[in-house]
Amino acid sequence: MKRTLQHIAVQGMLFASLVFSAFAQAAPPTNLKFCTGGVGGFYEGLGTSIGGKITNDIGNTLKVINTGGSVENAKRLKQGDCDIAIIQSDAVITQPMPASFKAVNAHEEVVYWLYPKGGEVDDFGDMEDDSVAKKYAFATVKGSGASVTLNNWIKTDKDYAGAVPVEFKDWYSAAEAVAQGFTMDSGVRVDIAGMLYIGRAGMLPADITSDFGGQILVGEVNDDSFANAKDANGNPLYTHCGIPKDKTSGLGRSNSISDQATYCLRAQVVFNNAYLNGLDEAETTLVRRAVDKGINSTVKVVR
């Protein structure tokens, strides 16, 4: 009798262990790692809101990761360092991405052309002219979404092939070069025409506006060729739009009469489907629904 009770007890423990093991394998990861953007920026706020709604439904913990922007986010997403990220739509199709992912359109972003007060190139399109391109370089921040757009535009319109980007480590350094109209590279002076910045309308970062607000102006982008760039589904990546006078974050404008002509594009929330690996059907359904609801209930407010 004693042996029978022991046998039953052992069987019960084995059964409980198997049940626990199956449950553990089916449970989602303990963390949801969300790659966003700079500290205090719009990407960080959006990621915190979306991620909070997802983890609240799943019952795990949100880990917000601050990054340098779209390029770094795409890299981290592919490497598995983050599970979900906010990335510019043109970076989604030009940067290496995970084998399987879901992308949802989020908010609209504006392409700002920023140039020095008193500068010659108040319109990005002027850099098509070889005589202008030979005199000036573009300032850009390494790894930023703006660097992706700049390179994509140069590839889209071969007339910009002579334009040279000069990379800076951050927006403050790039803004400083734009404000003074030049930078020194290996002891050689390089004149800077300006730089692109991409973000939510009216939300230029303090790195650009705080110390250099009186030295940098918002210019225009007048070139129809960029409307020809397409995404993987054949849809336009960039659409014509304007920057109203109250959306320059306090910077002066080259066009004092009407909105600044430029392009807009979408940011996307990108989810790595590898997050679902190892989950059973019920848990997969739960996580997918939480992700979809977390994204859509948030971005509908900011679209």
Residue spans for each PLM region:
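N-terminal hydrophobic or amphipathic helices and topogenic motifs
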Residues: 2-3, 10, 24-63, 248-262, ...
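Bacterial N-terminal signal peptides
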Residues: 9-21
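Short, glycine-/small- and polar/acidic-enriched structural segments
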Residues: 28-34, 42-126
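Bilobed "Venus flytrap"/periplasmic-binding protein-like clamshell domains
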Residues: 29-57, 115-180
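Structured segments of extracytoplasmic/periplasmic soluble domains
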Residues: 49-57, 76, 80, 84, ...
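Conserved beta-strand termini and adjacent loop/short-helix elements that scaffold enzyme active sites
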Residues: 65-67, 139-141, 168, 219-221
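Pocket-lining segment of extracytoplasmic ligand-binding domains
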Residues: 89-92, 119-120, 146-258
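Extended ligand-binding regions for polar small-molecule ligands
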Residues: 118-122, 128-137, 210-302
